[in-house]
């Protein structure tokens, strides 16, 4: 067995995604994805999803991530990590599934032929638009590792061209609806991800503190493969920073004392949703074609129902 990769604090330009996701820092480290788990769930959930803390951890293989990963790789320089599985329209047949499993076992991204063609189309539009908008992609798929008061942090940047961090997002949502896009970004934890990446970059490059900028490059998954350049407003930046700090503080505490608490073992009284209360109260008093309870019971007693 080969020794797992272990890297010191700093910038590392050529780290395989498998090594990064296995946690290549000197000590068990926190990523933005795991920080999201700490904020949205509990420390125990984060422990279960950490490759170096949970001895039974198994990486997740999911076709929904394949297209995005392949586009990232293609934008970063080619198709060396992409395995094209030919002769199939989907993954339903056993032979296709066997080739997919073999590709994953070899550290490759399995794609059907039409999926690879889609990757090429998306990447072509992305590169063309980036050039037209004057966006420098700089170093792509590079890893930054930093220590924050005893807490080790790691981040894999899609594109790092100081002072800019560019984050590619391949999306099926409607990119034309700003309100829906903002909700999606917060629900997915993109606000905290941006704050986390900026924080790690500033720890590695302290001379850039206060000058690191972050933008999302949203790409449509389907034609016409449009690209939207999104930056966070002041509120999104501040809320992301608060969530990030909360996650780092919990990580540091749990790693230090070796305790990863789950849910509280105390009853918690949940508040009834305001909007559901209003909905029912309005129904009680509003004119309606539906019989009320008194009228309905009266008709039942009279044999009319």
Regions found by a protein language model. Give the residues of each.
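Metal-dependent nuclease catalytic cores that hydrolyze phosphodiester bonds in DNA/RNA
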Residues: 1-155
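Non-catalytic protein-protein interaction segments used by genome-maintenance enzymes to assemble
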Residues: 144-191
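Short histidine-centered catalytic/ligand-binding loop motif
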Residues: 57-60, 104-111, 177-189, 233-235
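Secondary-structure boundary elements
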Residues: 129-136, 161-167, 202-212
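Short, well-structured alpha-helical interface segments that form or flank functional binding sites
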Residues: 66, 152-154, 189-192, 196, ...
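Hydrophobic/aromatic-lined pockets within catalytic cores
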Residues: 75-79, 170-173, 202-206, 252
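Short acidic (Asp/Glu) and glycine-rich catalytic loops that position anionic groups and cofactors
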Residues: 48-52, 174-175, 221-227
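Metal-dependent nuclease catalytic regions and adjoining charged, substrate-binding loops involved
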Residues: 4-10, 110, 186-188, 196-305
């Amino acid at each position: 067995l080969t020794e797992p990769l272990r890297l010191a604090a700093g910038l590392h330009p050529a780290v395989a995604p498998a090594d990064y996701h296995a946690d290549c820092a000197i000590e068990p480290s926190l990523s933005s994805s795991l920080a999201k788990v700490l904020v949205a769930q509990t420390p125990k959930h984060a422990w279960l999803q950490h490759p170096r803390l949970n001895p039974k951890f198994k990486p997740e293989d999911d076709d929904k991530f394949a297209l995005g990963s392949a586009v990232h790789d293609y934008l970063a320089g080619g198709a060396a990590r992409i395995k094209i599985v030919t002769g199939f329209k989907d993954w339903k047949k056993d032979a296709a599934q066997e080739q997919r499993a073999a590709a994953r076992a070899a550290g490759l991204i399995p794609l059907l032929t039409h999926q690879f063609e889609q990757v090429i189309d998306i990447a072509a539009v992305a590169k063309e638009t980036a050039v037209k908008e004057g966006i420098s992609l700089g170093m792509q798929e590079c890893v930054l590792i930093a220590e924050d008061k005893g807490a080790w942090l790691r981040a894999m940047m899609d594109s790092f061209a100081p002072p800019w961090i560019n984050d590619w997002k391949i999306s099926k949502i409607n990119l034309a609806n700003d309100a829906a896009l903002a909700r999606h970004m917060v629900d997915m934890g993109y606000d905290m991800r941006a704050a986390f990446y900026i924080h790690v970059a500033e720890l590695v490059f302290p001379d850039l503190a206060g000058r690191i900028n972050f933008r999302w490059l949203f790409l449509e998954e389907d034609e016409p493969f449009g690209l939207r350049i999104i930056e966070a407003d002041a509120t999104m930046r501040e809320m992301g920073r608060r969530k990030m700090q909360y996650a780092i503080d919990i990580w540091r505490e749990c790693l230090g004392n070796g305790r990863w608490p789950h849910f509280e073992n105390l009853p918690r009284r949940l508040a009834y949703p305001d909007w559901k209360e209003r909905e029912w109260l309005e129904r009680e008093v509003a004119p309606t074609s539906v019989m009320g309870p008194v009228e309905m019971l009266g008709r039942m007693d009279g044999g009319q129902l």
